Protein backbone atom coordinates (compact mmCIF):
# COMPACT_ATOMS: atom_id res chain seq x y z
CA UNK A 1 0.00 0.00 0.00
CA UNK A 2 1.21 3.51 -0.80
CA UNK A 3 2.04 6.00 1.94
CA UNK A 4 -1.17 6.67 3.87
CA UNK A 5 -2.25 10.24 4.46
CA UNK A 6 -3.92 11.06 7.78
CA UNK A 7 -5.68 14.43 7.52
CA UNK A 8 -6.73 16.24 10.68
CA UNK A 9 -9.23 19.07 10.19
CA UNK A 10 -10.45 21.28 13.04
CA UNK A 11 -14.10 21.90 13.75
CA UNK A 12 -13.46 25.63 13.47
CA UNK A 13 -12.45 25.21 9.83
CA UNK A 14 -15.49 23.07 9.10
CA UNK A 15 -17.80 25.89 10.25
CA UNK A 16 -17.01 27.50 6.89
CA UNK A 17 -18.91 25.80 4.02
CA UNK A 18 -16.39 27.22 1.53
CA UNK A 19 -13.60 25.42 3.39
CA UNK A 20 -15.42 22.09 3.22
CA UNK A 21 -16.02 22.55 -0.50
CA UNK A 22 -12.34 23.36 -1.04
CA UNK A 23 -11.20 20.42 1.08
CA UNK A 24 -13.46 18.06 -0.84
CA UNK A 25 -12.10 19.38 -4.13
CA UNK A 26 -8.51 18.68 -3.10
CA UNK A 27 -9.23 15.25 -1.60
CA UNK A 28 -10.96 14.00 -4.74
CA UNK A 29 -7.74 14.60 -6.71
CA UNK A 30 -5.42 12.86 -4.22
CA UNK A 31 -4.39 9.32 -5.16
CA UNK A 32 -2.93 8.08 -1.86
CA UNK A 33 -5.10 6.23 0.69
CA UNK A 34 -6.53 8.73 3.18
CA UNK A 35 -7.97 8.78 6.70
CA UNK A 36 -9.67 11.99 7.84
CA UNK A 37 -10.01 12.93 11.52
CA UNK A 38 -12.14 15.94 12.43
CA UNK A 39 -12.93 18.00 15.50
CA UNK A 40 -16.05 19.80 16.61
CA UNK A 41 -15.11 23.20 18.01
CA UNK A 42 -17.66 25.99 18.14
CA UNK A 43 -20.58 23.83 17.02
CA UNK A 44 -20.26 21.71 20.16
CA UNK A 45 -19.96 24.77 22.39
CA UNK A 46 -23.05 26.32 20.83
CA UNK A 47 -25.08 23.16 21.44
CA UNK A 48 -23.85 22.94 25.05
CA UNK A 49 -24.80 26.56 25.70
CA UNK A 50 -28.20 26.05 24.08
CA UNK A 51 -28.81 23.21 26.55
CA UNK A 52 -28.07 25.61 29.42
CA UNK A 53 -24.82 23.92 30.41
CA UNK A 54 -21.48 25.64 31.09
CA UNK A 55 -18.72 25.62 28.47
CA UNK A 56 -15.44 25.01 30.29
CA UNK A 57 -11.93 24.37 29.04
CA UNK A 58 -8.73 23.49 30.92
CA UNK A 59 -5.52 23.90 28.91
CA UNK A 60 -7.50 23.65 25.68
CA UNK A 61 -9.39 20.50 26.71
CA UNK A 62 -13.17 20.57 27.11
CA UNK A 63 -14.46 19.68 30.58
CA UNK A 64 -16.87 16.88 29.69
CA UNK A 65 -19.59 15.92 32.15
CA UNK A 66 -21.91 13.03 31.18
CA UNK A 67 -24.46 15.63 30.02
CA UNK A 68 -21.88 17.46 27.89
CA UNK A 69 -20.63 14.12 26.54
CA UNK A 70 -24.10 13.26 25.26
CA UNK A 71 -24.31 16.58 23.41
CA UNK A 72 -20.75 16.38 22.12
CA UNK A 73 -21.34 12.88 20.77
CA UNK A 74 -24.57 13.93 19.06
CA UNK A 75 -22.91 16.89 17.35
CA UNK A 76 -19.51 15.50 16.40
CA UNK A 77 -20.57 11.94 15.49
CA UNK A 78 -23.85 13.10 14.00
CA UNK A 79 -24.22 16.41 12.23
CA UNK A 80 -20.52 17.26 11.69
CA UNK A 81 -19.38 13.78 10.65
CA UNK A 82 -22.29 13.28 8.29
CA UNK A 83 -21.86 16.74 6.77
CA UNK A 84 -18.29 15.83 5.81
CA UNK A 85 -19.26 12.40 4.53
CA UNK A 86 -22.11 13.82 2.45
CA UNK A 87 -19.82 16.36 0.79
CA UNK A 88 -17.20 13.72 -0.02
CA UNK A 89 -19.66 11.13 -1.33
CA UNK A 90 -21.34 13.76 -3.51
CA UNK A 91 -17.88 14.45 -4.97
CA UNK A 92 -17.37 10.79 -5.83
CA UNK A 93 -15.24 9.84 -2.81
CA UNK A 94 -16.09 6.56 -1.05
CA UNK A 95 -16.22 8.11 2.42
CA UNK A 96 -17.32 6.15 5.48
CA UNK A 97 -18.39 8.02 8.62
CA UNK A 98 -17.17 6.50 11.90
CA UNK A 99 -16.28 7.32 15.46
CA UNK A 100 -13.87 5.47 17.70
CA UNK A 101 -16.83 3.60 19.19
CA UNK A 102 -17.58 1.73 15.96
CA UNK A 103 -16.06 -1.79 16.08
CA UNK A 104 -13.99 -0.52 19.03
CA UNK A 105 -11.80 1.39 16.59
CA UNK A 106 -10.34 3.66 19.29
CA UNK A 107 -9.98 2.65 22.93
CA UNK A 108 -8.92 4.99 25.69
CA UNK A 109 -8.40 5.60 29.37
CA UNK A 110 -9.40 8.70 31.36
CA UNK A 111 -7.05 11.64 30.89
CA UNK A 112 -6.15 13.41 34.14
CA UNK A 113 -3.53 16.12 33.44
CA UNK A 114 -1.80 17.08 36.68
CA UNK A 115 -4.44 15.08 38.54
CA UNK A 116 -7.25 17.32 37.29
CA UNK A 117 -10.56 15.55 36.71
CA UNK A 118 -11.96 16.75 33.37
CA UNK A 119 -14.81 14.24 33.33
CA UNK A 120 -15.23 12.07 30.27
CA UNK A 121 -12.00 13.16 28.58
CA UNK A 122 -9.80 10.33 27.37
CA UNK A 123 -6.38 9.59 25.94
CA UNK A 124 -6.14 6.97 23.19
CA UNK A 125 -4.45 3.74 24.26
CA UNK A 126 -5.31 1.47 21.33
CA UNK A 127 -6.12 1.87 17.63
CA UNK A 128 -7.46 -0.98 15.49
CA UNK A 129 -4.96 -0.44 12.71
CA UNK A 130 -5.86 -3.69 10.95
CA UNK A 131 -9.46 -2.56 10.53
CA UNK A 132 -8.38 0.80 9.14
CA UNK A 133 -5.97 -0.81 6.69
CA UNK A 134 -8.72 -3.14 5.50
CA UNK A 135 -11.03 -0.18 4.85
CA UNK A 136 -8.27 1.52 2.87
CA UNK A 137 -7.62 -1.57 0.74
CA UNK A 138 -11.33 -1.47 -0.19
CA UNK A 139 -10.86 2.07 -1.47
CA UNK A 140 -12.81 3.64 1.38
CA UNK A 141 -11.93 6.91 3.11
CA UNK A 142 -12.67 6.62 6.85
CA UNK A 143 -13.95 9.91 8.33
CA UNK A 144 -13.43 9.62 12.08
CA UNK A 145 -15.07 11.62 14.87
CA UNK A 146 -12.94 11.97 18.04
CA UNK A 147 -14.96 9.81 20.43
CA UNK A 148 -13.36 6.69 21.93
CA UNK A 149 -14.45 3.70 24.00
CA UNK A 150 -13.25 3.51 27.60
CA UNK A 151 -11.24 0.30 28.00
CA UNK A 152 -12.13 -0.10 31.68
CA UNK A 153 -15.73 1.13 31.90
CA UNK A 154 -17.12 0.80 28.36
CA UNK A 155 -18.26 4.43 28.30
CA UNK A 156 -17.80 6.93 25.49
CA UNK A 157 -15.08 9.56 25.93
CA UNK A 158 -14.24 12.88 24.33
CA UNK A 159 -10.71 12.71 22.93
CA UNK A 160 -8.72 15.62 21.52
CA UNK A 161 -8.84 15.26 17.72
CA UNK A 162 -5.15 16.13 17.33
CA UNK A 163 -4.30 13.25 19.68
CA UNK A 164 -6.58 10.91 17.73
CA UNK A 165 -4.85 11.79 14.46
CA UNK A 166 -1.43 11.34 16.03
CA UNK A 167 -2.38 7.93 17.45
CA UNK A 168 -3.78 6.72 14.12
CA UNK A 169 -0.75 7.95 12.17
CA UNK A 170 1.62 6.29 14.62
CA UNK A 171 -0.27 3.00 14.53
CA UNK A 172 -0.49 2.84 10.74
CA UNK A 173 3.25 3.45 10.44
CA UNK A 174 4.06 4.46 6.86
CA UNK A 175 1.99 7.61 7.01
CA UNK A 176 2.04 11.31 6.42
CA UNK A 177 0.10 13.16 9.11
CA UNK A 178 -1.25 16.49 7.87
CA UNK A 179 -2.81 19.05 10.22
CA UNK A 180 -5.01 21.26 8.04
CA UNK A 181 -5.22 24.61 9.83
CA UNK A 182 -6.19 28.22 9.17
CA UNK A 183 -2.52 29.19 8.95
CA UNK A 184 -0.06 28.16 6.22
CA UNK A 185 2.32 26.56 8.72
CA UNK A 186 4.45 27.55 11.71
CA UNK A 187 5.24 31.22 11.28
CA UNK A 188 8.40 33.01 12.43
CA UNK A 189 8.50 36.74 11.71
CA UNK A 190 5.52 36.26 9.41
CA UNK A 191 7.23 33.62 7.27
CA UNK A 192 6.48 29.90 7.09
CA UNK A 193 9.28 27.75 8.50
CA UNK A 194 9.60 24.91 5.95
CA UNK A 195 11.28 22.38 8.31
CA UNK A 196 11.39 22.01 12.08
CA UNK A 197 13.24 19.55 14.32
CA UNK A 198 12.09 18.67 17.86
CA UNK A 199 14.86 20.81 19.37
CA UNK A 200 13.82 23.83 17.30
CA UNK A 201 10.19 23.34 18.32
CA UNK A 202 11.09 23.38 22.02
CA UNK A 203 13.20 26.52 21.54
CA UNK A 204 10.32 28.30 19.77
CA UNK A 205 7.85 27.29 22.50
CA UNK A 206 10.20 28.48 25.24
CA UNK A 207 10.69 31.83 23.51
CA UNK A 208 6.96 32.30 22.85
CA UNK A 209 7.26 32.15 19.06
CA UNK A 210 5.01 29.08 19.10
CA UNK A 211 2.10 29.71 21.47
CA UNK A 212 -1.60 29.16 22.12
CA UNK A 213 -3.43 26.55 20.08
CA UNK A 214 -0.36 25.85 17.94
CA UNK A 215 1.43 24.23 20.91
CA UNK A 216 -0.73 21.06 21.08
CA UNK A 217 -0.51 20.74 17.30
CA UNK A 218 3.28 20.80 17.22
CA UNK A 219 3.48 18.46 20.21
CA UNK A 220 1.13 16.03 18.44
CA UNK A 221 3.33 16.34 15.34
CA UNK A 222 6.42 15.36 17.32
CA UNK A 223 4.56 12.53 19.10
CA UNK A 224 3.48 11.11 15.74
CA UNK A 225 7.11 11.09 14.56
CA UNK A 226 8.14 9.25 17.73
CA UNK A 227 5.39 6.67 17.17
CA UNK A 228 6.44 5.96 13.61
CA UNK A 229 4.75 8.43 11.24
CA UNK A 230 7.01 8.98 8.25
CA UNK A 231 6.21 12.67 7.83
CA UNK A 232 4.17 15.33 9.63
CA UNK A 233 3.07 18.70 8.25
CA UNK A 234 1.00 21.69 9.37
CA UNK A 235 -0.61 23.42 6.39
CA UNK A 236 -3.59 25.42 5.25
CA UNK A 237 -5.89 24.27 2.48
CA UNK A 238 -3.82 25.97 -0.22
CA UNK A 239 -0.70 24.07 0.85
CA UNK A 240 -2.33 20.69 1.38
CA UNK A 241 -0.43 18.94 -1.41
CA UNK A 242 3.15 19.83 -0.50
CA UNK A 243 3.27 23.13 1.41
CA UNK A 244 3.39 24.14 5.06
CA UNK A 245 5.84 23.25 7.81
CA UNK A 246 7.30 19.75 7.76
CA UNK A 247 8.47 18.22 11.04
CA UNK A 248 11.55 16.01 10.83
CA UNK A 249 13.69 14.05 13.28
CA UNK A 250 16.96 15.53 14.50
CA UNK A 251 18.84 13.12 12.21
CA UNK A 252 16.84 14.12 9.13
CA UNK A 253 17.16 17.78 9.98
CA UNK A 254 20.95 17.69 10.33
Swiss-Prot record:
EC numbers: 2.7.2.8
Family matches, as InterPro entries: AceGlu_kinase-like_sf, AcgluKinase_fam, ArgB, Asp/Glu/Uridylate_kinase
Reaction catalysis annotation: N-acetyl-L-glutamate + ATP = N-acetyl-L-glutamyl 5-phosphate + ADP
Pathway listed: Amino-acid biosynthesis; L-arginine biosynthesis; N(2)-acetyl-L-ornithine from L-glutamate: step 2/4
GO cellular component terms listed in the entry, alphabetical order: cytoplasm
CDD domains per record: AAK_NAGK-like (cd04238)
Pfam family, one: AA_kinase
Main EC class the enzyme belongs to: transferase
Any GO MF annotation of the entry: ATP binding
GO biological process: arginine biosynthetic process via ornithine; L-arginine biosynthetic process
Binding annotation for substrate: 40-41, 62, 158
Residue ranges that the Swiss-Prot or TrEMBL entry lists as coiled coil: none
Disulfide bridge partners, by residue number: none
Site (Transition state stabilizer): 8, 217
Gene3D superfamilies: Acetylglutamate kinase-like
Subcellular localization, as worded in the UniProt entry: Cytoplasm
Domain of life: Bacteria
Keyword field: Amino-acid biosynthesis, Arginine biosynthesis, ATP-binding, Cytoplasm, Kinase, Nucleotide-binding, Transferase
Function: Catalyzes the ATP-dependent phosphorylation of N-acetyl-L-glutamate.
Record-stated family: Belongs to the acetylglutamate kinase family. ArgB subfamily.
Protein name: Acetylglutamate kinase
The organism of origin for this protein: Chloroflexus aggregans (strain MD-66 / DSM 9485)
Amino acid sequence: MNTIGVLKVSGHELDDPHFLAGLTGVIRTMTQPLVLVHGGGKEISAAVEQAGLPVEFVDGLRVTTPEVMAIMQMVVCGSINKRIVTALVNAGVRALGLSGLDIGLLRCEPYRPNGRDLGRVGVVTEVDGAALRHMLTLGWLPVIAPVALGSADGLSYNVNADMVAESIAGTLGTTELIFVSNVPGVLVDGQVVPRLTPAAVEDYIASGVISGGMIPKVRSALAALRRGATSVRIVNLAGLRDGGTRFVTEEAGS
